Amino acid sequence: MDQSAVLAIASFVRNRSELKARKGLFQDKPTDFFRYKRFVRCLKSDAYKKKSLKQPDLYPPLPEDEEKFAELARGIFVEFIKNQLVVPGQKLHSYECKEHGLKPSKDYPHLIMSTKATLDDNEYYLWHYNPKTLTDYLIVFGVIGVILAFVCYPLWPASMRRGTYYLSLAAFGFLGVFFGVAIIRLIVFLISMLFIREKGGFWLFPNLFEDCGFFDSFKPLYGFGDKETYTYIKKMKKQKKRQAKKEKLKKLKEKAN
């Protein structure tokens, strides 16, 4: 297969919702990974069929026969591997991370490279292909535009310079208020630990420094310990999901027996 066709198909598949790509850590760097069967699903999508009708030289039409389709899909994916666009990988569980000298992450699973690519439906593959998107180009042009705007600051009209002055004052004022609130909440917490240590202390804006949205950082207004924090709530939701999966598997085993 021509390399331009391989890159075209990879670019098409790369950010498709059917691929259900997830974030993982490969060599401590965020990397997208997916299952082989999701790649096959992308090729079966209506969007790919439209592409193949318009540009059959870049997007080869896929046969209706399942065996021939599977063979062609495997051939395309083998080209992905040969061109190092993807590599076979393995998702590690927490206990497996320790065996490989990796520290388990709360947010992303750790990934390692596999030595074989069997193209099984549930086999994981890691993306090594990261084409530039329109957003990337817009960010570059935006940064250049901002730099040029500041370089030309002396040429700005007086009204614009006055506006940026007041805007900068407002920004510094916001930062001052933010750090003021952070200091006050720390003082209140330290004092509360003298009286309600068993509750984990009293926090104003318990989610202020949590990894959540801007407005969510100020919800709720107060809380005790870490039970109101975004991280704790997220952790409890994950535990409930795991427990539900375990119970489901247990019921299936009981039915099988």
Curated annotation (Swiss-Prot):
GO terms for biological process: post-translational protein targeting to membrane, translocation. InterPro entries: Sec62, Sec62_asco. It is a multi-pass membrane protein. Pfam families: Sec62. Residues 159-170 are lumenal. GO terms for cellular component: Sec62/Sec63 complex; translocon complex. It is found in: Endoplasmic reticulum membrane. GO terms for molecular function: protein transmembrane transporter activity. The chain crosses the membrane at residues 138-158, 171-191. Residues 1-137, 192-257 are cytoplasmic. Keywords: Endoplasmic reticulum, Membrane, Protein transport, Translocation, Transmembrane, Transmembrane helix, Transport. Its main location: endoplasmic reticulum. Part of a complex that contains SEC61, SEC62, SEC63, SEC66 and SEC72. NCBIfam families: sec62 (TIGR00869). Belongs to the SEC62 family. Required for preprotein translocation. This is Translocation protein SEC62. It comes from Candida glabrata (strain ATCC 2001 / BCRC 20586 / JCM 3761 / NBRC 0622 / NRRL Y-65 / CBS 138) (Yeast). The gene is SEC62.
